[in-house]
Amino acid sequence: MTDKSSAPSRSSRRVLLLAALLGVTAVATLVVTAVLVSIFEHKMDARSPFMRVVDLNEVSVDPSLWGQNWPHQYDQYLMTAGDTFYGGSAALPESKLDQMPWLKRLFAGYAFSIDYREARGHAYMLYDQVVTERVHQRQQAGACLHCHASPTVLYRWAGLEAMGLPSDEAALAADFNMPAVMKGFEVLSTKPYFEVLEMLTRMPDGTPGAPGPFPSPPVGGFTREDAPPGHFAMHEAHPVSCIDCHDPKTMAVRITRPGFMQGMADLAAGDAPVNAMPSVDRWRRGDRKEPYDPNKLATRQEMRSFVCGQCHVEYYCATMDTLEFPWAHGLRMEDMERHWDEKVFPDGTPFYDYYHGETGARLFKAQHPEFELWNQGVHARAGVSCADCHMPYERVGAMKLSNHNVRSPLENINNACQTCHNVSESELLDRVKEIQGRTVALKERAAAAMTEMLDAILEAKAAGATTEQLTPILALQSKAMWRLDFIVSENSKGFHAPQESARILGESIDYSRQAQTKALRLRAPEAPPTDDLPMEPVRGVTPTERPEAHR
């Protein structure tokens, strides 16, 4: 009885065991299959990180078009406006002229003494320029839009027109056409600002009649009292857009600004040392038959800085000549100063940005030389690009993307800094604050030296100093103020190259004090002779008693 009943029991256990094994195998198969499918899908995502919903071309300026293909990057681009786009006069950043009143004396005679404010994100770059009092109280050049707008379609149109070639929308959309863009850039650089702005609003942007992602600025300023004749809408004009840095067909990073193309060709043709630019060194060792072209020769890592260097640079931007990057002698502050010193305008007059409103000195105005100062710093020497810090990589699913919310690295320390610096966030913040604090303190000392220099020059003029006597003093003033302005206008507060910033400010102080001393000598009466004053010979050992003459 027992033997007969145990046989079915063993058989049942075998069936259950077999079923369990089949179940485990099935589950394991499903898990492995799911993992393999997930890996395959992630690999496919990494190979094809976007789905092309709309076709783009060379007139697809409106970034909302690109956002349909790359929604993640577009959403981050919109974040450059902050949580909400703040327009209107009450929303403008605080005036630097109120923060640092001595700037009014630094810029006396120049439009920046009228209105000069803290910079905001890329979303505001066109808005804030259109409403600044600088463009309403003083006539500015169309060259300003080279960097404050997305102007390449306009440049191409003007170039094709000047070259006698078709310039309809089909021709504009077909090809970037750098020769036409360069020609249009030359044609429009010296034209009045509002004339070029109005032309920009008539260019196709891929979404005719539709408003852009950000509100349009009031073209006549906030009161509209100074609105130019034929007041126009701003719908088709955009701040920097996707098309300014990317090829719409391949998405490759590219250079679109004519000023940078010419500036890099001039830099490469010279012999000045450069950091983080291996393609320039390779070109210099070659046959040099064609000018250096970053779009053909630069590495991807170089391009991650070059696209920023299209605008975050020093340049001439006014009505006397075509916009120009002063890089023929190099990227150091004194290299650019030498370039401006040697330059003459087309009419033969020596180059200047403005003549100082108090002293009449011929001065150069620095713009925002972040690219040049960065090139002198340790990060550039280490091969760290602008985008590595300001647009750091991040993981989104299987994709590795650059963060398109372009901003200070201090707002994204984990991705921007701690991928290289294995220290705490608080320590990194303290390092930056220390560097910037020292630079600001030195800047204030340079500003104090500048104001005392200006006072001394004015007193010398009041005392009857001649033009011949003042000429070398005004040359020192120019050197002092160029150096101070260089660091004031650069937006990192010295962080991009701390030692270089300190050197430049130290030279500014030195030149200011030299000019002040010479001016005081012109103002003061002749100094009495010092030959009869008691004097103790220099000794190698400190004497134990006071000299007889000083008892």
Per-region residue spans from a language model:
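N-terminal Lys/Arg-rich, disordered targeting/topogenic segments
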Residues: 1-15
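Intrinsically disordered, low-complexity acidic and serine/threonine/proline-rich regulatory regions
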Residues: 118-127
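Primarily the internal scaffold of c-type cytochrome electron-transfer domains
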Residues: 14-23, 32-119, 156-238, 248-388, ...
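A cross-kingdom signal targeting lumenal/periplasmic-facing segments of multi-pass membrane
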Residues: 137-155, 159-161, 168-170
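Mature N-terminal, pre-catalytic/accessory segment of carbohydrate-active enzymes
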Residues: 527-540
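Long, composition-driven intrinsically disordered regions
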Residues: 113-118, 131, 140, 150-152
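Outer-membrane beta-barrel channel domains
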Residues: 148, 239, 243-248
